[in-house]
Amino acid sequence: MKKYFLFILTTLSLTACYTTKNLPEDEVLYRGIKKLDYDAQLKRDSIQGQGVITALADAYNTVEGLLTGDANALKTEEADKGLIKDSLKKADKQDALNYETAKEEIKAALAYSPNGAIMGSSYYTHPFPVRLWIYNKYVNSTTNFGRWMMNHFAATPVFVSSVNPKVRSTVAHNTLRNYGYFRNKVTYDTIPMSNPRKAKISYHVKPGPVFHLDTIKYLPFYPQADSIIKATMNQSLLKQGKPFNVQDLDAERKRLQKEFRNNGYFYYRPEYISFRADTVMIPQKVQIQVRPLPETPAQAKHPYYIGNTRINIYKYNKFQLTDSITFRGQTYAYSNTEDRPPLRLRAILPNLFLKKGDLYQQTNQDVTQQKLADMDIFSSMRVSFVQRDSTLNNDTLDVVISGMLDKPYDAEFIGKITNKSNNYVGPGISFGMRKRNAFRGAETLGLNVWGSYEWQTGAHVEGRNSLINSYEYGATASLSYPKLMMFGLEKKRWRRLISSTNFQLDAKWVNRANYFGRVSFGASINYTLQKGKNIKHEFSPFSLSYDLLLNSTERFDSIITANPALYISMRDQFVPSMEYTFTWTKEKEKHLQTLKVNLKEAGNVTSGIYAICGQGFKKPEKELFGVPFAQFVKLSAQYTHRFTLTPRSCIGTRLFAGVVYSYGNASTAPYNDLFSIGGANSIRAFSIRSIGPGSYHPERSSYSYIDQTGDFKLEANLEYRFPIIANLYGAAFVDAGNVWLIKENSNQPGGQLKMSEFGKTIALGTGVGLRYDLDFLVLRFDLGIGIHAPYDTGKTGYYNMTSFGKSLGYHFAIGYPF
């Protein structure tokens, strides 16, 4: 053992020398940041924090005491003290968030990866910098092989001089000033290592006290601008008591510019607004003056109105306009190659909100640009304005809209490999094609075909013919419009909202070796309406699917005979349904909240027609075209909340609840509309569909997971996400929940929801995970650890897992679970 240890030490010593063997004499190899120290005082001094608030409260209490007596004065004093305490607490939170944000920018300014960095870290390196060794070996080589090694495998050494810690310290110093730390000090030390040709850098940051905004005064601009400022003062981003922040100043300039432009001041720019700050008058306070730039151009002080509109539409890769037409004072010019416009004028006009004679408004320009972009048929689009002439007496802006149509066709090909838990593996492919502006009305015609086949692996293959004959394939055709196609029922005010309509047809054929063959057909109409940034409506007034069981084996017949719920979900049936989804999103400071509510009904309209014709609404076994149809109501809601602790760490929560109730024509909803639980995006200590309903736990088999669905679902998740190194993040989580049956089923004992057994039937798991953020993609690994199984495991007590090893769940996934 001692010999191996000495060998490792000798190897590391030699390699350490080899990383600096051929470095320039006056250079020192940079080996990363040794430490980054902060010396901060976040809490406000009591005098600084209470200041004006306390003085006002004391004055108020004195007057109140003179008017109503000492008793009331004491009550008022206690109330005001509570108000002061809450105000200080809120102010401390603002200071803490401001400081953490500044720290993240300082880290970014000081960060610099050395050679051999682990995942881009500025602190940690691996012991074998092979590319640096190659540099030292071949940097002076004159052979072809040496030059080839240098060009393809060597890494240029990172020197302390190229890191330039002095400049980085200055950048960090200026960053702190931008966040209100005007008395900050940032220094650095170069720390030599055992090899004097190598060094690390330590940075020392002393922010000092943060300065807060005191008085904010808006100096006169010009009469109408002053009226706009006064009317929108409550929307100002500069608030007394907030930490000084340059970003708030920039945001306030942009806010005022938008307000001015929404009132006709087309030529107004943010740089026409300046600030003057006084940090001397009151200690640790900043007095701000918002003032107009003296050199503001005369054009920026006058409102403008919309004139004529010209629309230029170029075909893909055609740069000449050959024809034009005039309609209602608007000129439409286009590239003509087929004796007709490439885009119908009526497809463009509903997306224009710049009406002749109207006062120019930034909002109308933004909506027009957004609606044109959402048409998804242009490779480039520009909305520009041209003043009739340059004199101040002319207040008219002509609109020029120029767009080049995108290439008409898009295609994609996807290949995949499936590996299922029942030992089935196999490849799959899909091919999709889209045609933009298919009928010259901005519509998109899409077609997608896909297929896959599987075979069973392992020692016990089910049947001799199951090698390749488990397969499925299907096709989807869709026609989408970037607007609501409601056949005259749409409201005019909806035109300004982002919307779309999608008509879809689909078909799928599934063959499961030794079980069944099944075909499904579907048709649907879907509407989407986006109301602002926070609210989204999705409505499907018509959706009809038809499932047909083509053939089945005796083995599968025995399974569905023993399970009536499975039989109902697999029988030939129509599912006529309507569906509505409401999504609400709110993002404010450190909070991101999302609420999604979905309501789906099936068969009720059809049953209503039967009732009008004299048959009972809840009468069972009604048929549509000679085939039974499903009848149910399904409601689900999901709420997520992400609370940001620091710019790189947060706490995420999710709460999901859902219920599906079947009645009338069916005792059970179709299988696809039932709830299941477990897996990479649910309770991660248990695999998908391995728990529930309730305490029911079937014997394991290839298709036992089919049984484990329910009518009611409740799930809660809590996850803490934190940084580890560079783009590698960690997570710790807790998951809980289950699915239950509303009605008792003798084939699934313990599956019914009972309040007396509710706590025992909640599955609980915890665990840890890793997330690697590639900016465009997040790779995720989670290790779930079971705490409590909702079924009988043979062990007593709340922790009832049979063994620690069997309680683990491993999940590789893409993206966050919620």
Enumerate the predicted regions with their spans.
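C-terminal beta-signal and terminal closure region of outer-membrane beta-barrel proteins
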Residues: 677-680, 685, 746-818
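Gram-negative/organellar outer-membrane beta-barrel architecture
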Residues: 228, 341-342, 361-596, 684-685, ...
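Strand-connecting loop/turn motifs
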Residues: 181, 265, 408, 440-442, ...
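Bacterial Sec-dependent N-terminal signal peptides
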Residues: 1-29, 175, 655, 814-818
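Membrane-embedded beta-strand positions of outer-membrane beta-barrel proteins
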Residues: 413, 445-449, 503-505, 595-599, ...
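C-terminal outer-membrane beta-barrel translocator/porin domains of Gram-negative envelope proteins
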Residues: 333-334, 418-422, 538-722, 733-755
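Interaction-mediating elements
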Residues: 18-374, 383, 396, 493
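Solvent-exposed coil/turn segments that connect beta secondary-structure elements
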Residues: 189-191, 204-210, 218-223, 273, ...
